[in-house]
């Protein structure tokens, strides 16, 4: 499961065998996941939200999860959006330690103070962010199709 994007792509999930004596942390819709280790400070603790109900889904050892306990106070998608903002990415990347691999302490990350506007404003921010991300993804898809078209044309031009 990749947590490098805003939302987890459930189609990319794989299965593993879990022994009965292994303790596993079950994840739920709305949970946030953070990378604990990265090659760069800029990617350490990037987070992603699970937007779907998935049965028997457990946390892996490469990331840690966070569950918002009071959804009346903070919207999990807003928190994800906030933690991707340049202001918070800078604070989070400064918490990363290491040279070859940059690691982050879960406890240090959980000490981070975040701005929490009223719920109406949080939902507005999430809506705007989702619309922008949709537009970006649409443009990326168009660019990819144009690049494929160009590649095909170039191959046919110089046969």
What is the predicted function of each stretch?
Residues 108-111, 115-159:
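Amphipathic alpha-helical coiled-coil/heptad-repeat segments
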Residues 56-64, 74, 96-120:
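A short glycine-rich beta-alpha junction/loop motif
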Residues 21-26, 40, 54-55:
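Short, surface-exposed secondary-structure edge patches
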Residues 1-33:
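Sequence-specific dsDNA recognition surfaces
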Residues 41-48:
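Short, Lys/Arg- and Gly-enriched loop/turn segments at beta-strand edges
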